[in-house]
Amino acid sequence: EGKNLLDKNCDIRKFREEVGMVFQKFNLFPLKTVVQNVMMAPILTKHMNKEEAHAKALELLDKVGLKDKADVYPSTLSGGQQQRVAIARALAMEPKALLFDEPTSALDPEMVEEVLKVMVNLAKQGMTMIVVTHCLAIRSI
């Protein structure tokens, strides 16, 4: 949209709410279940009620193929599954764009494809993504 983030009149906090971030190391909360990880930000920042946040989280977990893992803890998931939870968590804030910092570099090679499939589906749905990576397979997105 051509926003000048250096402009003193730019509401940087509002801009940050429009951009999601997915990190290399997932950064999931280990003492929260998968669904709680996805629900947390909308409840705390958008003041969404818990029932609505739970329903939205389950919808997003289904979108990344992990609805059946909603009530487990991150430590029980593979790296690829944890990264997909991180993607669902970023999507829970309904961003206009997603930033990915090496989304596949911490994964075993066999887990890379499941994360790439989610990213391809997001691209097909029109999600703007900025990806920093060394993974050449991502070029096809």
Predicted regions and their residues:
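ABC family nucleotide-binding domain
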Residues: E1-I141
